[in-house]
Amino acid sequence: MATNLSVIMILTFALWVTNPLHELQSTAAFSQTTEKINSNWESGINVDVAVTMQRHHLQQLFYRYGENDSLSVEGFRKLLQNIGIDKIKRVHIHHDHERHSDHERHSDHERHSHRGHAAAGKNSRKAFCPDLDSDNSGKNPNTSQGKGSRPAEHVNGRRNGKESASSSEVTSAVYNTVSEGTHFLETIETPKPGRRTKDINPSTPPSITEKSRVGRLSRLARRKGNDSVSEPRKSFMYSRTSNDNIQECFNATKLLTSHGMSVQALLNATEFNYLCPAIINQIDARSCLIHTASEKKAEIPPKTYSLQIAWLGGFIAISIISFLSLLGVILVPLMNRVFFKFLLSFLVALAVGTLSGDALLHLLPHSHASHHHSHSHEEPAMEMKRGPLFSHLSAQNLEESSYFDSTWKGLTALGGLYFMFLVEHVLTLIKQFKDKKKKNQKKPENDEDVESKKQLSKYESQLSTNEEKVDTGERPESYLQADSQEPSPFDSQQPTLLEEEEVMIAHAHPQEVYNEYVPRGCKNKCHSHFHDTLGQSDDLIHHHHDYHHILHHHHHQNHHPHSHSQRYSREELKDAGIATLAWMVIMGDGLHNFSDGLAIGAAFTEGLSSGLSTSVAVFCHELPHELGDFAVLLKAGMTVKQAVLYNALSAMLAYLGMATGIFIGHYAENVSMWIFALTAGLFMYVALVDMVPEMLHNDASDHGCSRWGYFFLQNAGILLGFGIMLLISIFEHKIVFRINF
């Protein structure tokens, strides 16, 4: 009994050992049979013809890029440059990539069309890169079983054996090559009930019968069209590379080193075959192509909202700027005080900072922009379809780096402008300080000559009185009546006659000046005489102060061109009628307001932040401008109501310019970039030519004010203007305002 039991146990153990060997032998026999059947015909491809064409194409490649049947690194680099995968490029696209096969509609220079990744099961890629089985020594351990009429299972060999069932998608064997050169196989088959699926070698293609069954099942699944599939079909490789990792753009050196090849090695045809999968993988994964159409921000409002914001924002901005003329009514009592002069100096400096900052930090970068924000309303859907990883890399890194690069360069230009302003201003202050110090040192020496100078002064005053009597018939009565009139609120803006004689007026010998200017008048000689006599002695006091009162107005006209309250002398305002002066204000300021409205309208069509930036710049430089216009009209004899009315009429052209800018920016978006460039030039001209000289040639000491106080106040205004424009430029993409009706 024990002997029988022992024999049974031995036989059982022998059967248990020999059964796996039998299975292995049957598996090997099955593989050999499959290879013999498909030796000359693999998945519909004639191997003999494929090998012949492979040799032909290799000969062509080596003939173009190699020498003596070998390919050097330089030749290989030229090959990569020719197919466009040697470096990252930006490709402009204008359509949505809803499925991967849509790349066939690209232009010829993009050359990355795909004919459906499911067709890769026919070993089309192996026809281009044969001998893939030379690197594959292992087998795919993943298997799939089917029972009854159960749908096929999708086995994924690259995700650690995890299986995902699908009832509508059936794919055949797909060869996938990553940059490291390791080959993976994605398989699917529909076995018969009760039959166990064997392991499939990645280098062994499916048989013809299996291929036909897979094709029938694929067509059947497509006809059924399962509703559970909610997104377009993608190949396994594309979904893997776009979601799980970032394909690096390999150049020639990286491709060689990643395949274990020396950079100095000479490649033959066999070694070049190993590089084919990596090259095809980079072309297929578009590793070296970046679509600039995906760089647009998803949070930009649609164009319909932008048009509504443009009209509303432009109307509000123009209205606020136009109402600045009413501010002159409030500031009339303050115009006689020193505080108003400090305020005006700060406003001029603020205008310089905002105008130049808007030109260099906003208008010029937007005029060089390669895309327009208004046609990005379809981009959020495109970003969602491409995945969050691609959207994050393209939208944030690329756009922010390119836009902020222009912003930092503009900020550097502003730094150079501010540096030169500081240098010129500080040198002027140092020179004035030295002159004042020398003047204080000479005072003790001149004390001895005080009595003699007093006597000389009396003699000169008597002589000037006699000359003025002679000159009475040759000059207008208005010049003589100027001193007898009641001083208006605006007369206090000018320095007194004593201040003019001591500081602003260049003194000359009375007889020479009288002989030169009395016969011919001073109408055409004021400016030249002022500069010709600027450096002469100040020992004598000038005699005809009325003439130099006119000269003082011309001095302010030359050095303060942007302040309209000092452009015209009192007699010019009286001689000109109210209607003529009103026409000058309406046309002159109206043209200026039209250009401002044009810039604001075009800027608001670009976006809310763009319109806000330009509106702030226009507001800051229009504030002293409108105050000057109001003062000129009041000085001409107008009432407050009339001055407000004429300023309102000139503001109407600003609304017309705003409407023109909105229409141009909305319907001709390429023209708006040119408007931005033109506006930047206008802003820079107004800031540097009109306002900076007024800052540098201030008459602070003439009014008993500190020059250093003016200096620090002007610096505060400039830096504040720079800071406002810089903040708007940096955070403009986050300034979003939507209007829903």
Swiss-Prot record:
Molecular-function annotations in GO: monoatomic cation:bicarbonate symporter activity; zinc ion transmembrane transporter activity
Topology, Extracellular side: 21-311, 363-409, 665-672, 732-741
Localization: Cell membrane; Cell projection, Lamellipodium membrane; Membrane raft; Apical cell membrane
Signal peptide residue numbers: 1-20
Function: Zinc-influx transporter which plays a role in zinc homeostasis and in the induction of epithelial-to-mesenchymal transition (EMT). When associated with SLC39A10, the heterodimer formed by SLC39A10 and SLC39A6 mediates cellular zinc uptake to trigger cells to undergo epithelial- to-mesenchymal transition (EMT). The SLC39A10-SLC39A6 heterodimer also controls NCAM1 phosphorylation and its integration into focal adhesion complexes during EMT. Zinc influx inactivates GSK3B, enabling unphosphorylated SNAI1 in the nucleus to down-regulate adherence genes such as CDH1, causing loss of cell adherence.
Subunit description: Interacts with SLC39A10; which triggers cells to undergo EMT and mitosis. Found in a complex with SLC39A6, SLC39A10 and with the 'Ser-727' phosphorylated form of STAT3 throughout mitosis. Found in a complex with SLC39A6, SLC39A10 and with NCAM1; this complex controls NCAM1 phosphorylation and integration into focal adhesion complexes during epithelial-to-mesenchymal transition (EMT). Found in a complex with SLC39A6, SLC39A10 and with GSK3B that controls NCAM1 phosphorylation.
Protein name: Zinc transporter ZIP6
Lineage: Eukaryota, Metazoa, Chordata, Craniata, Vertebrata
